[in-house]
């Protein structure tokens, strides 16, 4: 490799790092779990990110796409992604087996303000694929449990078969140091023993919160936000302590292509985590 090539390799932000798929399996019919490690072990262990950030994954000959990190930085070395089959890149990823090679660059975005959240009550509200980015911050809170006050999770899915990381969430219910409430819109199995209804029906089950001492993290389908925010405001949680992770047409990850721009806001740089206060002033965000 000549000097110019070495220079470009180190300075070009679009150059992905080679990575290997360590483990992959179906979470649901159209959602797969991917555990990935950078080939360079030194870089793998040094890969630093915050919960809520994302990375670009690429498949040779197909292209690349942004995916939120579902792992936690408190467990270095391996990166985890929860991916739904929805397009060209995801279809190519779904065909790959364990030990297959992919490209990875990142991390990108702002992530959750975990330093500000320390010592606070944490209420996580998620629906459907909203689990993917919020799993990162949930695992981070569990790995650093003594640094946070109350932790509560409200998770809703359409059907039991569509509940992502189902076993993980049921295991959370066995823990004595957090709340975990689960719901499905409808039970087509006849064996579902948890709540039936949309995720907002879980709010009455939530133990009393101290609004000024609470951060709420929200992610789910667009239709969910309006109703969840309404419930959080009823609890008097401050608008700047309601955090929403929004992935809006992100393409390059570094604020160059303009695909995710809303006026002066770039989702890939200024987000994907926004406060409800931000959203009120940028209504196109949701």
Language-model features and meaning:
Residues 88-251:
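FNR/FR-type flavoprotein reductase catalytic core
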Residues 258, 263, 274-286:
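Short Fe-S-cluster ligation motifs
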Residues 35-37, 82, 105, 125, ...:
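Beta-strand residues in well-ordered beta-sheet regions across diverse protein folds
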Residues 223, 247-272:
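Local cysteine-cluster metal-coordination motifs and their immediate loop/turn environment
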Residues 3-100, 158-159:
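Ferredoxin-reductase
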């Amino acid at each position: 490799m000549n000097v110019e090539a070495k220079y470009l390799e180190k300075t070009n932000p679009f150059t992905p790092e080679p990575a290997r798929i360590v483990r992959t399996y179906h979470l649901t019919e159209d959602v797969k779990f991917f555990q990935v490690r950078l080939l360079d072990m030194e870089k793998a262990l040094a890969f630093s990110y915050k919960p809520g950030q994302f990375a670009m994954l690429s498949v040779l000959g197909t292209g690349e796409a942004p995916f939120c990190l579902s792992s936690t930085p408190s467990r270095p070395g391996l990166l985890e992604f929860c991916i739904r089959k929805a397009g060209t890149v995801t279809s190519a990823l779904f065909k790959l087996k364990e030990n297959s090679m992919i490209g990875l660059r990142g991390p990108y975005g702002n992530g959750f303000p975990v330093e500000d959240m320390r010592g606070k009550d944490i209420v996580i509200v998620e629906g459907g694929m909203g689990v993917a980015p919020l799993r990162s911050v949930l695992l981070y809170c569990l790995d650093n449990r003594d640094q946070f006050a109350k932790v509560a999770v409200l998770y809703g899915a359409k059907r039991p078969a569509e509940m992502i990381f189902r076993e993980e969430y049921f295991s959370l219910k066995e823990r004595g140091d957090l709340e975990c409430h689960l719901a499905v819109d409808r039970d087509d199995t006849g064996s579902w023993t948890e709540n039936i209804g949309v995720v907002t029906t879980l709010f009455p089950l939530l133990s009393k919160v101290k609004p000024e001492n609470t951060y709420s993290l929200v992610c789910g389908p667009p239709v969910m936000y309006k109703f969840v925010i309404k419930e959080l405001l009823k609890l008097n949680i401050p608008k700047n302590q309601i955090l929403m992770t929004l992935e809006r047409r992100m393409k390059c990850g570094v604020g160059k292509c303009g695909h995710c721009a809303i006026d002066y806001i770039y989702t890939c740089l200024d987000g994907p985590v926004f406060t409800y206060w931000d959203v009120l002033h940028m209504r196109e965000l949701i």
